[in-house]
Amino acid sequence: MSDKDSKNTPQVPEKLGLSRRGFLGASAVTGAAVAATALGGAVMTRESWAQAVKESKQKIHVGPGELDDYYGFWSGGHQGEVRVLGVPSMRELMRIPVFNVDSATGWGLTNESRHIMGDSAKFLNGDCHHPHISMTDGKYDGKYLFINDKANSRVARIRLDIMKCDKMITVPNVQAIHGLRLQKVPHTKYVFANAEFIIPHPNDGKVFDLQDENSYTMYNAIDAETMEMAFQVIVDGNLDNTDADYTGRFAAATCYNSEKAFDLGGMMRNERDWVVVFDIHAVEAAVKAGDFITLGDSKTPVLDGRKKDGKDSKFTRYVPVPKNPHGCNTSSDGKYFIAAGKLSPTCSMIAIDKLPDLFAGKLADPRDVIVGEPELGLGPLHTTFDGRGNAYTTLFIDSQVVKWNMEEAVRAYKGEKVNYIKQKLDVHYQPGHLHASLCETNEADGKWLVALSKFSKDRFLPVGPLHPENDQLIDISGDEMKLVHDGPTFAEPHDCIMARRDQIKTKKIWDRNDPFFAPTVEMAKKDGINLDTDNKVIRDGNKVRVYMTSMAPAFGVQEFTVKQGDEVTVTITNIDQIEDVSHGFVVVNHGVSMEISPQQTSSITFVADKPGLHWYYCSWFCHALHMEMVGRMMVEPA
């Protein structure tokens, strides 16, 4: 059905003329021709453009039974989860609950998940932005994925062999973990996490003045293996996004609130903010020497990276850049930190090989490390790379992705007349993050790019006032970008990454010795239970522990009796050994639900507060007799 025939398409008042869809549709071919002419290329006809788009669309077709070339990991934003997509098909493969409660798997309900979440299990929400895969020698090693929670100041780790969160930490002394990146070489030793908001220290309600000397935020490093704090560095201003270099020595972060303001006008007052660069080796040496303080009850080493009386600390350098910078991205060739201007139409290119001289005091001006500042368009937010010397930056206000050549931008900064902009592509609409395949590694392959647009407007069937986001897949394998797919997503992915499918190795069934459910195994041992075979009920005062196996289509315990008010823990081990035969356990009217996949042990605790007969059943369709996979909990009145 065409738009003009659809009665479910939002109408545009006549006085406003064409809708944006109509305008862009009418001008697409003309715009492409003008762009090609401006860039010195051949003018594309309507037919040649249509053929090019058709060929690109054929690349994304993944037929029935065929597999995608890449794993894509999307942050779930304020949904609090991570989503796994296949690329280029853009099919959603799995959702990994992290900071949210998930009734399908029982995440946030099961004892195993709550043990991992720790004290923060009390929070039912999260806001995750930046997923990143662990690396060795600048390449994805497929071991872990890390994700931030801005809402409750947490960082979580996901084991990629099982696609489950296995560690979580609340970062002390700070609020709102936003930017998150990983050390790239020699391996991911640290997870670098920006705390965005400035708070008083101690934050005990006695001081609210952000200009106070003891009001600040910190740059945080977490040990990637133990998921414990490694160190924190106090900074001037606030922190937005971050990235690390390919030497293992430097990390950098953008600051958009050098004013330490709390109001919109105040945060835009300065014409320049900065990128703060951290010397990780200097920080490590100070920690090793015991040259640090601690704050409150936390034992985390804290170092002061602020300027004192105009003098730099040995840990940091502040590089002025145009106002309110946002994205901070390391080029895949390892040469540059690139800070996107946001309120400036420029990106600032920091030459990483000049940073040792900056820290050694050999440069007269911190801006001597800036080797390029290309003007790209309105609202530059984030930059990605194709491994062929080109960068791609989102332009939020212009609703475009701009492709530009980095070395030509450096030449232009020196005064040479060169057109470093290669193409501008309309996206729909207002893009934030973007990510090219393997772009944050030294193996960037320049095949696919995803632009994560914040508004979808008229791109999909209307679904009410809340619209989906629009994640658009772009073919960048040739000389020109080609938009090939619109992907609606629920609120609100911020960023994504792509890894080759050979870089991710997953288990087909659980290992019975997996540490994920080790605390539950230990509990069973204390009760003298063999989880692989035993089906028993153990009473310990008003605590009842029900142990059972499950093999489709039957639970090992088909009924058990408790008293009203008992605390009941049900532990189930799925002894099926067939891939994909997952079981579920739901107790009706009790808010109890969990997943038990093959060879997995899961447990859940609840209070049997209602007398009477209560059925439990398998919520997964695991067998032809799935409906008959039930049991009874009989609750005697108190």
From Swiss-Prot:
Question: In the record, what terms sit under GO molecular function?
Answer: calcium ion binding; copper ion binding; cytochrome-c oxidase activity; nitrous-oxide reductase activity
Which residue positions does the secretion signal occupy?
A: 1-52
- Residue positions annotated to bind Cu cation Z2 are 129, 178
User: What is the name of this protein?
Assistant: Nitrous-oxide reductase
Its function, per the record, reads: Nitrous-oxide reductase is part of a bacterial respiratory system which is activated under anaerobic conditions in the presence of nitrate or nitrous oxide.
What the record notes about the co-factor is: Binds 2 calcium ions per subunit.
**Any idea which UniProt keywords this protein has?**
Calcium, Copper, Metal-binding, Oxidoreductase, Periplasm, Signal
Q: Which reaction does it catalyse?
A: N2 + 2 Fe(III)-[cytochrome c] + H2O = nitrous oxide + 2 Fe(II)-[cytochrome c] + 2 H(+)
Q: List the top taxonomic levels of the source.
A: Bacteria, Pseudomonadati, Pseudomonadota, Gammaproteobacteria, Pseudomonadales
Q: Which GO terms describe its biological process?
A: copper ion import; denitrification pathway
Record-listed Cu cation Z4 binding positions: 494
The record's annotation in InterPro entries points to: CcO_II-like_C, Copper_CuA, Cupredoxin, N2O_reductase_N, N2OR_C, NO_Rdtase, Nos_propeller, NOS_propeller_2
The subcellular localization recorded is:
Periplasm
The residues listed in the UniProt record as binding Cu cation A2, with positions renumbered to this chain, are: 618, 620, 622, 626
Functional pathway: Nitrogen metabolism; nitrate reduction (denitrification); dinitrogen from nitrate: step 4/4
Binding residues for Cu cation Z3, per the UniProt record? 130, 433
How would you summarize the oligomeric state and partners of this protein? Answer: Homodimer.
**Residues noted as binding Cu cation A1 in the record, renumbered to the chain:** 583, 618, 622, 629
What organism does this protein naturally occur in? Answer: Stutzerimonas stutzeri
| Pfam families the record matches | COX2, nos_propeller, nos_propeller_2
Cofactor entry: Ca(2+); Cu cation
**Where is this chain primarily localised?**
periplasm
Record note on modification: Predicted to be exported by the Tat system. The position of the signal peptide cleavage has not been experimentally proven. The N-terminus is blocked.
Q: Give the protein family.
A: Belongs to the NosZ family.
Q: Where is this region: COX2-like?
A: 542-638
